[in-house]
């Protein structure tokens, strides 16, 4: 067992992401777009399965609560309510649990973020399709080769990790960078001393 080797792989993924100019520009574009969306009184919706669902919930609480410094709460929804998920899964099928949430909460001009470490989650694919049909800006946090979701979103981050845990770790870093970017744009006074 070589745990250090495993973490070296993770750091190599992280290093590649950080050094990739296109990825940095894409992250900045998403942060700017989301700041504009919030400024217009719109919101962000996000979803994922398993650990990615936890990442989605972590992302929204940083907006509805706070990230680093005091500021007003920002409108963010994770499609993760257990009663919604079990109702839709029972009545329509598991592949509709997120798209029905997008249908209910999404409005034209909002942002939707779908997280899938494989890029092949049927329920995330359907949610992206629903978001696009309703005029939401779409962002995909994907893994491996991007799977079926590759090319479906307005903005994409494809992390070519071999295991879901390593992909999720980079996804969470991307989400934190987006949050910080939004705060720096909307609340520059909070970052004056840096």
Swiss-Prot record:
Major location category of this protein: cytoplasm
Could you tell me the keywords of this UniProt record?
Carbohydrate metabolism, Cytoplasm, Isomerase, Metal-binding, Zinc
Q: Which cofactor does it need?
A: Zn(2+)
Q: What class of enzyme is it?
A: isomerase
Q: Does the keyword Cytoplasm apply?
A: yes
Q: What reaction does this catalyse?
A: 2 D-sedoheptulose 7-phosphate = D-glycero-alpha-D-manno-heptose 7-phosphate + D-glycero-beta-D-manno-heptose 7-phosphate
Q: Which Pfam families match?
A: SIS_2
Q: Per UniProt, where does Zn(2+) bind? A: 58, 62, 168, 176
Its pathway, per UniProt, is:
Carbohydrate biosynthesis; D-glycero-D-manno-heptose 7-phosphate biosynthesis; D-glycero-alpha-D-manno-heptose 7-phosphate and D-glycero-beta-D-manno-heptose 7-phosphate from sedoheptulose 7-phosphate: step 1/1
Q: Where in the cell is it found?
A: Cytoplasm
The residues that the entry says bind substrate are 49-51, 62, 90-91, 116-118, 121, 168
| Assigned GO CC terms | cytosol
Which GO molecular function annotations are given, in alphabetical order? carbohydrate derivative binding; D-sedoheptulose 7-phosphate isomerase activity; zinc ion binding
Q: Per the database record, which ranges form the SIS domain?
A: 34-188
InterPro entries the record matches? GmhA/DiaA, Phosphoheptose_Isoase, SIS_dom, SIS_dom_sf, SIS_GmhA/DiaA_subfam
A Gene Ontology biological process noted in the UniProt record is: carbohydrate metabolic process
The annotation note on the cofactor reads: Binds 1 zinc ion per subunit.
> What EC number(s) has UniProt assigned to this enzyme?
5.3.1.28
Further information: The reaction produces a racemic mixture of D-glycero-alpha-D-manno-heptose 7-phosphate and D-glycero-beta-D-manno-heptose 7-phosphate.
What the protein does comes down to: Catalyzes the isomerization of sedoheptulose 7-phosphate in D-glycero-D-manno-heptose 7-phosphate.
Name the family the entry cites. Answer: Belongs to the SIS family. GmhA subfamily.
Q: What is this protein called in UniProt?
A: Phosphoheptose isomerase
What species does this protein belong to? Fusobacterium nucleatum subsp. nucleatum (strain ATCC 25586 / DSM 15643 / BCRC 10681 / CIP 101130 / JCM 8532 / KCTC 2640 / LMG 13131 / VPI 4355)
């Amino acid at each position: 067992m070589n745990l250090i080797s495993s973490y070296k792989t993770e750091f190599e993924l992280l290093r590649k992401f950080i050094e990739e100019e296109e990825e940095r520009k894409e992250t900045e574009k998403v942060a700017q777009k989301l700041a504009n969306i919030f400024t217009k009184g719109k919101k962000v919706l996000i979803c994922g399965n398993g650990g990615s669902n936890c990442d989605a919930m972590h992302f929204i609480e940083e907006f509805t609560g706070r990230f680093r410094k005091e500021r007003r709460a920002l409108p963010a929804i994770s499609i993760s309510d257990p009663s919604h998920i079990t109702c839709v899964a029972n009545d329509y099928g598991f592949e509709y649990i997120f798209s029905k949430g997008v249908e209910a909460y999404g409005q034209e001009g909002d942002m939707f973020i779908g997280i899938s470490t494989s890029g092949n989650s049927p329920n995330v694919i359907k949610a992206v399709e629903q978001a696009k049909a309703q005029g939401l800006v779409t962002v995909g946090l994907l893994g491996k080769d991007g799977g079926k979701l590759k090319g479906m979103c307005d903005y994409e981050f494809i992390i070519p990790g071999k295991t879901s845990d390593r992909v999720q770790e980079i996804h969470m870093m991307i989400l934190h960078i987006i949050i910080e970017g939004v705060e720096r744009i909307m609340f520059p006074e909070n970052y004056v001393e840096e």
